[in-house]
């Protein structure tokens, strides 16, 4: 059997970007034949990508891009916070955000089919899965195209905001975007709050008010008061400005002769159920897998 040297491992790693131990295993299996080892490794990485692509992705980043009269916000997911900080993953997320803004894909499927690096976005995504060993998915995106101004704000790459606004001061757009990230409104105004959210809040308020034992007319007023308070708390224009608790967002905008047309807020992993593994079960699974090898 041919001796596997460190330089051989380094050369194979440079060609494939595979982990060092994987390169050494492939070279050993190929009896030192670099070309054969590369082929074996590509097969293994393909299998690895296939397996990883079925796993839950609840971590990740939000990326943004603004250019010309268009802006985009994109959420990409991975499995661990460690990979969410990986340079290749971050670079891919920024590229995807730029593609959304400049190419205007209709949906994630159309985005995935766009050309990238001599291939497609999806092919690059699958190659990234093989390289880092975790599932990577493009979850969602939003794109604004307007003659108005666009502001974005990222908080630790886990919360992202994009705002369309009018007004002379760019700081206003930045302030509103930062406020949205902090206070997480669900709608621009009270009239825009989805009916299902209001219905849910009303049911909760009715149950609480009914427990008070007060007369029906008092209960009705209590419910209405609770709903109105909720609408004030979740609608952007009615919220108290985080940088000045003496003003609402609406008052701040009016003072600056500005207005917000729309916004979008992404929070990484929002609504995705994380897989919670039992440690003992995980060890048992690894032992069982080792016995089968």
Curated annotation (Swiss-Prot):
One of its GO terms (cellular component) is cytoplasm. Residues 80-83 are annotated as: Involved in Mg(2+) ion dislocation from EF-Tu. Disulfide bonds: none annotated. The keyword RNA-binding does not apply. Pfam families: EF_TS (PF00889). Keywords: Cytoplasm, Elongation factor, Protein biosynthesis. One of its GO terms (molecular function) is translation elongation factor activity. It is found in: Cytoplasm. Belongs to the EF-Ts family. Associates with the EF-Tu.GDP complex and induces the exchange of GDP to GTP. It remains bound to the aminoacyl-tRNA.EF-Tu.GTP complex up to the GTP hydrolysis stage on the ribosome. This is Elongation factor Ts.
